[in-house]
Amino acid sequence: MGFLTAVTQGLVRGADRMSKWTSKRGPRTFTKSRGAKKTGFYTNRKFVQIKEMVPEFVVPDLTGFKLKPYVNYRAPAGIDTPLTAKALFLETVAPAIEKDFKEGTFDANNLEKYGFEPTQEGKLFQLYPKNFPR
């Protein structure tokens, strides 16, 4: 009983629980690594590698590719403008409406052709009125 009491007191009173888990602290099966998965197993102090466990890197052919694989840390940050309803409309639906208007086939009563939904009935998430608890 004395051993268990000493161990629990050491843990409760602040034994170093945050220290690095090394082979001195861990079991015999512990192998120090950087998070990579093992590609085999040990048998009688010999490592047997399994071909199916070795990762394969699929790299596309980059011949003639002009960009370099390095970005300078002093490069200016990119500017991402937030996506608004107007911008989404102008990118997706507006070209089709303009095309139909120029051809003379635009019908204001048939907006379902462009993705317009007159009612939100039957939808799980309705856009209007807002369906969230207050």
UniProtKB/Swiss-Prot annotation:
Q: Where does this chain mainly localize?
A: mitochondrion
Tell me which domain of life the UniProt entry assigns to the organism this sequence originates from.
Eukaryota
- Cellular component terms (Gene Ontology): mitochondrial large ribosomal subunit; ribonucleoprotein complex
From the UniProt record, give one GO term of the biological process aspect.
apoptotic process
Q: Which Pfam families match?
A: MRP-L27
Q: Which GO terms describe its molecular function?
A: structural constituent of ribosome
Q: Does the keyword Transit peptide apply?
A: yes
Provide the protein's localization: Mitochondrion
Q: Which UniProt keywords apply?
A: Apoptosis, Cell cycle, Mitochondrion, Ribonucleoprotein, Ribosomal protein, Transit peptide
- The transit peptide of this chain lies at 1-13
Q: Which family does it belong to?
A: Belongs to the mitochondrion-specific ribosomal protein mL41 family.
What is the stated purpose of this protein? Answer: Component of the mitochondrial ribosome large subunit. Also involved in apoptosis and cell cycle. Enhances p53/TP53 stability, thereby contributing to p53/TP53-induced apoptosis in response to growth-inhibitory condition. Enhances p53/TP53 translocation to the mitochondria. Has the ability to arrest the cell cycle at the G1 phase, possibly by stabilizing the CDKN1A and CDKN1B (p27Kip1) proteins.
PANTHER family the UniProt entry points to: LARGE RIBOSOMAL SUBUNIT PROTEIN ML41 (PTHR21338:SF0), MITOCHONDRIAL RIBOSOMAL PROTEIN L41 (PTHR21338)
Provide the assembly information: Component of the mitochondrial ribosome large subunit (39S) which comprises a 16S rRNA and about 50 distinct proteins. Interacts with BCL2. Was also identified in the 28S mitochondrial ribosome.
Write down what this protein is called: Large ribosomal subunit protein mL41
User: What is the scientific name of the source organism?
Assistant: Rattus norvegicus (Rat)
